[in-house]
């Protein structure tokens, strides 16, 4: 233990902050300094496909239906917010009801993204449909388009949003919770290093009130 390797895949929102802090904390634990990590990013669909082909040992992603080979363990909650440019008519609001935004051009996540199904479900819950003008896979790319007034969007509330000139609006309706999951193959051998890392992930998220 302490000298193995972990192949880790994760969705884009976790790249700037969560994964670096997590891994740094793990390798600085006594006995873990020689553990080697390989990293990859992608959409939930692509990550789970690569998990099943054993490119990855562990994936952090949204949950997916009909994946009987995969065990999903919730590790953290991620708030979804509406973002608009600073001059947008919605920018004066303190929160947004999704039933009231269908008239505005909407920048959506692509269909391969796990978050797309969640956002579609939120609109369905208020009997509404967004006016989708384009699809983008990555959060920062969406924020950049919103900043230049190409459209509005719904994204996870991540630290990187502060680097864009956008207004962040909480969603008042519908009520929602979005979770990030740790995904592993049910019937695959798990090395001592992998088991140790999984346990650390659970403790890290609990300690940081993410779970």
Where are these regions (language model features)?
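A late-sequence structural motif
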Residues: 18, 168-211
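Short loop->beta-strand "edge-of-pocket" segments that line small-molecule binding or catalytic clefts
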Residues: 7-9, 80, 96-115, 205
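Hydrophobic hinge/microswitch elements
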Residues: 43-48, 52-55, 61-62, 112-169
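Short, well-ordered beta-strand segments
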Residues: 5-9, 59, 83, 107, ...
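Beta-alpha-beta core module
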Residues: 67-79, 140-187
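Flexible hinge/capping segments at coil-to-helix
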Residues: 67-106, 191-192
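Central regulatory/effector-binding core of bacterial HTH transcription factors
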Residues: 3-67, 135-136
